[in-house]
Amino acid sequence: MSKRTYQPSKVRRNRAHGFRKRNATKGGRDVLKRRRAKGRKRLVVSAPKK
């Protein structure tokens, strides 16, 4: 039996899929642009503010 592959970590999730990571590349900025155009409430996955 192999272990589950999803081992959640807020830090790792934000580093991989956060706003700064998206903004760092042309493709990522395109993603943000599309999500803004679509009217997404949340542009990126990120830990909710406390």
From Swiss-Prot:
It comes from Myxococcus xanthus (strain DK1622). InterPro entries: Ribosomal_bL34, Ribosomal_bL34_CS. Residues 10-24, 32-50 have a biased composition (Basic residues). It comes from the Bacteria. Residues 1-50 are annotated as: Disordered. Keywords: Ribonucleoprotein, Ribosomal protein. The keyword Ribonucleoprotein applies. One of its GO terms (biological process) is translation. This is Large ribosomal subunit protein bL34.
